[in-house]
From Swiss-Prot:
The gene is pgk. The keyword Transferase applies. ATP binds at K204, E326, G352, G353, D354, T355. Belongs to the phosphoglycerate kinase family. It catalyses: (2R)-3-phosphoglycerate + ATP = (2R)-3-phospho-glyceroyl phosphate + ADP. This is Phosphoglycerate kinase. Substrate binds at D22, F23, N24, R38, H61, L62, G63, R64, R120, R153. It comes from Geobacter sp. (strain M21). Its EC number is 2.7.2.3. InterPro entries: Phosphoglycerate_kinase, Phosphoglycerate_kinase_N, Phosphoglycerate_kinase_sf. GO terms for cellular component: cytosol. It is an enzyme of class 2 (transferase). It is found in: Cytoplasm. GO terms for biological process: gluconeogenesis; glycolytic process.
Length: 399
């Protein structure tokens, strides 16, 4: 069944529209937002609903308050920033459920926007509790999910709440996320290349197993590469290795090779004598990692190899950095890959999280076709899983 989108709902005028957004944005010590991409990402849906004269009730979480009210996790900074971006008042409710909130919603005029307080102030949110979901729905008329980044969570404001509405739909951000994912994984223009990085194989092994059936090339960088390299018999010193996953990693490698997938691993690396920005470093081939040293970035020969592997790519999907790019000494590999991906002639899709941060830092944001707002959600799609938040929209949101 197909998902219904916000622009397919008839007559939103005067309707109370409950929209789940993801305003889980980073804050500094003074509660100032340091990066507002997630807020900007849902402006198209909010502005559409405003144009349709809907009454908009926004719900989000921020941080991990673990079912308790903690003021440092208040949605106040997000409401303030959204107010500035929309050029109109966004009222912050004192809570997300209760009589006071209900009265506030009932007093709304068409075109008003209310931001509910953090839904994770209640344990019922993460427990997907039906009673909490009903209280949260507050007799609203329409439910819209535009929070892709939390759609892999079976939480009350994402899944259970859909049972409280006659009409459920997805917003434009969700539409973008699904469209680009389908372009990459369902109907890709080939060759399709997947780049996977990050520290641990354990976080990506299911992704790898799923991608073996779909991609033409797999490029592995970051700490996770060293579990594969140790499995191939290399001495990797003190580099990060998940010994319990060596067999699994090698089976996945063999599966990819058997299916004709080209599999690229680092041929050299930047090693350090300790995990420290001021550590002594040097570049060495994979075969010559010194005893007691650890690899913290891919080396220049690897960058050349990986860049050449991207030369003929028509679709590139990337999740996970090539090294510990937060430290300058180990950032060159990741930034070189950002440049290679950004300057390719392919459709380029970058998964959220660290890779998103690296692309921003490298100043290549505008050259990437699409940067996903979801880290975990993006990974679960790559694993071939149905996300709970999307499944309920498919089940209940058909026209």
């Amino acid at each position: 069944m197909s998902i219904r989108y916000i622009d397919e709902i008839e007559n939103l005028s005067g309707k109370k529209l409950f929209m789940r957004v993801d305003f889980n944005v980073p804050l500094d010590d003074n509660q100032n937002i340091t990066e507002d991409t997630r807020i900007r990402a849902v402006l198209p849906s909010i502005n559409y609903a405003l144009d349709q004269k809907a009454k908009i009730i926004l719900a989000s979480h921020l941080g991990r308050p673990k079912g308790e009210r903690k003021e440092k996790y208040s949605m106040a900074p997000a409401a303030k920033r959204l107010s500035r971006l929309l050029g109109k008042e966004v009222k912050l409710a004192s809570d997300c459920i209760g009589d006071e909130v209900k009265a506030m919603i009932n007093a709304m005029q068409p075109g008003d926007v209310i931001m509910l307080e953090n839904v994770r102030f209640y344990a019922g949110e993460e427990k997907n509790d039906a009673d909490f979901a009903k209280a949260l729905a507050n007799d609203c008329d329409v439910y819209v999910n535009d929070a892709f980044a939390v759609s892999h969570r079976a939480h009350a404001s994402v899944e259970a709440i859909t049972n409280c509405f006659p009409v459920v739909a997805a917003g434009f951000l969700m539409k973008n996320e699904m469209n680009y994912f389908e372009k990459a994984m369902k109907n890709p223009i080939r060759p399709l290349v997947a780049i996977l990085g990050g520290a641990k194989v354990s976080g990506k092994i299911e992704v790898l197993e799923n991608l073996c059936d779909k991609v033409d090339k797999i490029i592995i960088g970051g700490g996770m590469a060293f579990t594969f390299l140790k499995g191939m018999g290399y001495n990797v010193g003190k580099s990060l290795v998940e010994d319990n996953l060596i067999d699994t990693a090698m089976k996945t490698y063999e599966k990819a090779r058997a299916q004709g997938v080209k599999f690229y691993l680092p041929v050299d690396c930047v090693v350090a004598d300790q995990f420290n920005p001021a550590a002594e470093t040097k570049v060495c081939p994979i075969q010559e990692i010194p005893e007691g040293w650890m690899a913290l970035d891919v080396g220049p020969a690897t960058v050349t190899l990986f860049t050449e592997a991207l030369q003929n790519a028509k679709t590139i999907v990337w999740n996970g950095p090539m090294g510990v790019f937060e430290m300058d000494a180990f950032s060159r590999g990741t930034f070189a890959m950002v440049s290679a991906v950004a300057n390719s002639y392919a459709l380029t899709i970058v998964g959220g999280g660290d890779t998103d941060v690296a692309v921003h830092r490298a100043g290549e944001y505008a050259k990437i076709s699409y940067i996903s707002t979801g880290g975990g959600a993006f990974l679960e799609l790559l694993e071939g899983k149905k996300l709970p938040g999307i499944k309920v929209l498919e089940d209940k949101g058909h026209l």
